[in-house]
Amino acid sequence: MCGKTVGALRLHFTMADNPGLSPEIRQRYERLYTGTFYRRFVLGEWAAAQGLVYDFFDPARDAAPVPEGPFGRWRVSVDYGTVNPLSMGLWGERDGVWYRVEEVYYDSRREGQQKTDAEYADMLERLAAGREIQRVIVDPSAASFIETLRQRGWRVKKANNDVADGIRVTADLLRQRRIVLCDTCRDCLREMALYCWDERTGRDAPRKEHDHAMDEMRYFAMDLMGERSGGFAVTSVRRQA
């Protein structure tokens, strides 16, 4: 209030101050994070998200050729769009690592023609190319498309669409090489180089552009993390206005 002095106590803790973490675990987390998340979760700073969302990712180093030989499991992630682009990613698993091996990216503005749900379902059929797909993880707002896929016999799961937590989980899995982007996924790699934090919002939120492959990759990562046990993901600390 005006005319009164309000006392405040500021306490600063770092990850090293947590007695519940062994030195080995602390070292693992220190290797896991970079940039803003390192400053927050390791150094204990209240840092704003800025710059590229996946600033640690170097396509020349981190994008990989599609591995030769068979994959054990297959899944597809989908970010639905009619006016905005549609993105589908085909993921194959080998030795505990999931590779994004192929993609469909359809931009109706660029192509000059919108597609129907049935036409998008046909694209999914061609992407799957006869492989046994465990499930299709879809943008939860795409109700009509989800119904079209289910009518065609696809096993569909509505994605967890928590953006801030999903970005952290995706970053963790990329850094751990639990998910790998293959060099065949050109539109996904293009978006990786353009996907930025929106510094105008005052909270952890990316700009709503160059985010279609980014969204479906996030859907896949959240689905994968949800079925894992004993994994680590910080999902409780976020910056708000």
Can you say where each PLM-predicted feature lies in the sequence?
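Short, conserved catalytic or adaptor-binding loops enriched in Gly and charged residues
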Residues: M1-V6, P65-P67, T170-L174
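Conserved beta-strand scaffold positions in the cores of enzyme catalytic domains, especially
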Residues: A8-H12, R75, V156
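A residue-level signal for conserved active-site and pocket-lining positions in enzyme catalytic cores
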Residues: F13, V42, D79, M88, ...
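ATPase catalytic-site recognition across NTP-hydrolyzing enzymes
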Residues: N18-V78
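Gly/Thr-rich phosphate-binding beta-strand-loop-beta motif of the actin/hexokinase/Hsp70
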Residues: G69-E93
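Mg2+-dependent endonuclease catalytic cores in nucleic-acid-processing enzymes, primarily RNase H-like
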Residues: D95-K208, E227-A241
